[in-house]
Regions:
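C-terminal motif of bacterial Sec signal peptides marking the signal peptidase cleavage site
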Residues: 29-32
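A structured, mid-to-C-terminal "fold-capping" secondary-structure block
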Residues: 144, 149-253
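Beta-rich strand-turn-strand
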Residues: 84-86
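Mid-length scaffold segments of soluble, non-membrane domains
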Residues: 89-167
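Bacterial signal peptide processing site
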Residues: 34-38
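Post-signal peptide N-terminal segment of mature Sec-exported envelope proteins
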Residues: 40-70, 88
């Protein structure tokens, strides 16, 4: 193990030639040097993941949560709902593409109808007219598309700044954040960064109450986030009807 860690440091020294994603995956692999025989089979990188979780949690409490709290307090509910609707409408475009890639006809049709109705009759998506017309959302991303076609989730990974993920979703993330996000194509940098920040803050504001409740009841926040995330993503890939998982082998003593 020491040999592999030393080799990893030599490779990391050439990080200027690595893409950000490759560097991140390298860090996760190197973290495997710290795993032991009793590691959770779904979370073999737990030491690395816990450190990233603590980093993200500290950053959230220091910056994001206070900003989201202030945003929620000073922004009228109607305006915040409009902000959420606007970004949901953008996400529905990518959901349409992934529903098509997964050969989900109903999901693709509904997503296309939602985008059309909300864009033209909902003031560019600020009003959710489609939901009033009972046109359901079918959110899909590229990670779900890979899962649909048999790509396994792989080990659980906590990404700095992005939070809980899996190896499959980490590979899909650059596609979701570039090809699948129209905001990234805005050439005006101040406008693009403003929209990114607004979406981040608005998303955090929507889960403030749930986060506070979790702080009170969760004995181990890391384990709770991991298990709930893995279950949620599994349900999303299989549209709420995941197959039964095979019993996990007992760790060697």
């Amino acid at each position: 193990m020491k040999f592999h860690c030393r080799a990893g440091r030599q490779v990391a020294g050439r990080s200027s030639r690595l893409s950000p994603l490759a560097a991140l995956l390298l860090c996760a692999v190197l973290a495997g040097c710290a795993t032991g025989p009793n590691a959770n089979p779904k979370d073999p990188l737990e030491p690395f993941n816990r450190s990233m979780f603590e980093f993200n949690d500290a950053l959230d409490h220091a910056v994001l949560k206070p900003v989201a709290t202030a945003y929620k307090e000073v922004t009228p509910d109607l305006l915040r709902r409009g902000v959420g609707n606007f970004f949901n409408n953008i996400e529905d475009v990518w959901s349409f593409v992934n529903n098509v890639l997964q050969l989900k006809g109903e999901g693709a049709a509904n997503s296309l109808m939602r985008v059309s109705v909300n864009t033209f009759f909902g003031l560019g998506g600020i009003l959710d007219v489609a939901s009033e017309m009972k046109i359901e959302r079918h959110p899909e991303d590229f990670g779900q598309t890979l899962g649909r076609w048999g790509v396994g989730a792989g080990p659980y990974v906590v990404l700095p700044f992005f939070g809980p993920s899996t190896l499959r979703d980490t590979v899909a993330l650059p596609v979701d954040k570039t090809v699948g996000d129209p905001v990234t194509k805005i050439e005006d940098i101040p406008v693009r960064n403003t929209l990114w920040t607004l979406r981040l803050v608005d998303n955090r504001a929507q889960v403030l109450k749930a986060g506070d409740l979790l702080e009170e009841i969760a004995l181990d926040k890391y384990t709770f986030f991991r298990d709930s995330h893995l279950q949620r993503r599994r349900n999303a890939v299989f549209d709420g009807n995941p197959p039964e998982e095979e019993p996990e082998a007992e760790p060697e003593q």
